[in-house]
Regions:
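Pocket-lining segment of extracytoplasmic ligand-binding domains
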Residues: 71-72, 151-205
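Small-molecule pocket liners
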Residues: 26, 91-97, 103, 194-198, ...
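Short, low-complexity disordered leader/linker segments with a strong preference
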Residues: 1-12
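Short helix-initiation/N-cap motifs at beta->coil->alpha
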Residues: 46-56, 69-71, 138-158, 169-170
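Alpha-to-beta junction loops
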Residues: 42-44, 58-68, 80-83, 114-117, ...
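Short loop->beta-strand "edge-of-pocket" segments that line small-molecule binding or catalytic clefts
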Residues: 11-19, 109-122
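Short, polar/charged alpha-helical segment
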Residues: 10-12, 21-47, 75-79, 127-135
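Flexible hinge/capping segments at coil-to-helix
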Residues: 100-116, 202-205
Length: 205
């Protein structure tokens, strides 16, 4: 009989990612591909959706972790959810408002009377939109806001909207790869708030 100890049973961990499969989650993909999580005894299950939904699921321990914006944690705590922000994922707030370069939208004030696409009125995208508008003394009533789901790159490329709110590593990169230059308005240039991070619950930690 072998004297080697039996390998410990893997622990199942659910991680909610508030988007669709994307380059921004590359560290998790690499970790799974190279077996880093498996070597640590973790069976990692990734799921994609909306971060406001995952916040509730993490709060009741249906999911153990999520990647979400700091503001969502504050809102969750205010609602009594036992969620905790434990790891900074970005050093800068990752969301921008981007547009085709020929639209000449380079600063918040130039969004007035423009059609702006956004996944919905929630999460990091909505926080960035509100912050950027406020920097110019604008409100949502000063723009035409359209909920377009996660179709930002296509919506901007096809001129369905003048600009869209997206992660800097997503929509603007997709257009750049297609040869379409863009302008980007970054929230961090006007307001510094906690960026997205790894969120868990008090039971897990």
């Amino acid at each position: 009989a072998s004297d080697e100890p039996a390998a410990p049973a893997s622990e199942s961990v659910k991680l909610g990612l508030g988007f669709i499969p994307s380059i921004q989650f590359a560290p998790y993909y690499v970790g799974i591909e190279k077996g880093f999580f498996q070597d640590a005894g973790i069976e990692l299950e990734l799921s994609y959706g909306f971060e406001n939904d995952y916040l509730k699921l993490v709060g009741i321990d249906e999911y153990q972790f999520m990647v979400g914006s700091g503001d969502q944690v504050v809102l969750g705590r205010a609602q009594g959810l036992p969620v905790r922000y434990v790891l900074n994922w970005y050093t800068r707030f990752p969301v921008v408002i981007f547009s085709k370069a020929d639209r000449a939208i380079t600063q918040p004030a130039e969004l007035a009377d423009k059609t702006v696409g956004i996944p919905g009125a929630f999460g990091a995208s909505y926080v960035a939109l509100r912050g950027i508008l406020e920097a110019a003394g604008l409100t949502e009533q000063d723009i035409r806001l359209e909920s377009i789901g996660f179709t930002q790159a296509a919506a901007v490329s096809e001129d369905k909207v003048d600009a869209a709110v997206d992660y800097a590593v997503n929509g603007p990169v997709v257009l750049a790869l297609a040869g379409t230059p863009t302008n980007q308005i970054a929230l961090d240039d006007y307001l510094v708030i906690p960026a997205n991070g790894l969120v868990t619950n008090e039971k897990t930690i």
